[in-house]
């Protein structure tokens, strides 16, 4: 039994037929076109805004506000040890991480976390390093230079 081009057809359910709304009773979507009868949702350009509950006090206003977003967290990037293998050279700083496209250019701080293997001895300057990552770095022969605000 060979495969013939003239016998090819798409699988069952692969092609759906288009719904032609408002084109007669037989289509199943005639007259009101699946919109029901009257009301705001049946009109063209209709719809209520997101979260609107018909005039009732909406959930997002019933629930109290809480917390805040730390701006420090928004400008601090987490870097895995395994990602450091992309860096040319032996010094790791925020600038070298940006140059190697490991962190975004709008990041001001970096934090090295223990995830993956480190294969080379690096010197870390001006970045935070977790305890586990520091142990792995020193085991690989690297050093971590502690500056103001980078100790964990």
From Swiss-Prot:
Residues 1-54 are annotated as: Disordered. One of its GO terms (cellular component) is cytosolic large ribosomal subunit. This is Large ribosomal subunit protein uL15. HAMAP family: Ribosomal_uL15. Residues 24-37 have a biased composition (Gly residues). Part of the 50S ribosomal subunit. InterPro entries: Ribosomal_uL15 (IPR030878), Ribosomal_uL15/eL18 (IPR021131), Ribosomal_uL15/eL18_sf (IPR036227), Ribosomal_uL15_bac-type (IPR005749). Keywords: Ribonucleoprotein, Ribosomal protein, RNA-binding, rRNA-binding. NCBIfam families: rplO_bact. Binds to the 23S rRNA. GO terms for biological process: translation. Transmembrane segments: none annotated. SUPFAM superfamilies: Ribosomal proteins L15p and L18e. One of its GO terms (molecular function) is structural constituent of ribosome. Belongs to the universal ribosomal protein uL15 family. Pfam families: Ribosomal_L27A.
């Amino acid at each position: 039994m060979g495969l013939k081009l003239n016998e090819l057809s798409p699988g069952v359910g692969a092609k759906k037929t288009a719904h032609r709304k408002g084109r007669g009773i037989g289509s199943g979507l005639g007259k009101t076109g699946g919109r029901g009868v009257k009301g705001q949702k049946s009109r063209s350009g209709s719809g209520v805004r997101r979260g609107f509950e018909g005039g009732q006090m909406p959930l997002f206003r019933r629930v109290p506000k809480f917390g805040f977003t730390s701006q420090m967290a928004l400008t601090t990037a987490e870097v895995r040890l395994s990602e450091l293998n992309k860096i040319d050279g032996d010094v790791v700083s925020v600038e070298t991480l940006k140059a190697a496209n490991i962190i975004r250019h709008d990041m001001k701080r970096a934090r090295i976390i223990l995830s993956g293997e480190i294969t080379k001895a690096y010197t870390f300057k001006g970045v935070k390093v977790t305890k586990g990552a520091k142990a792995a770095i020193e085991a690989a022969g690297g050093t971590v230079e502690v500056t103001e605000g980078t100790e964990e």
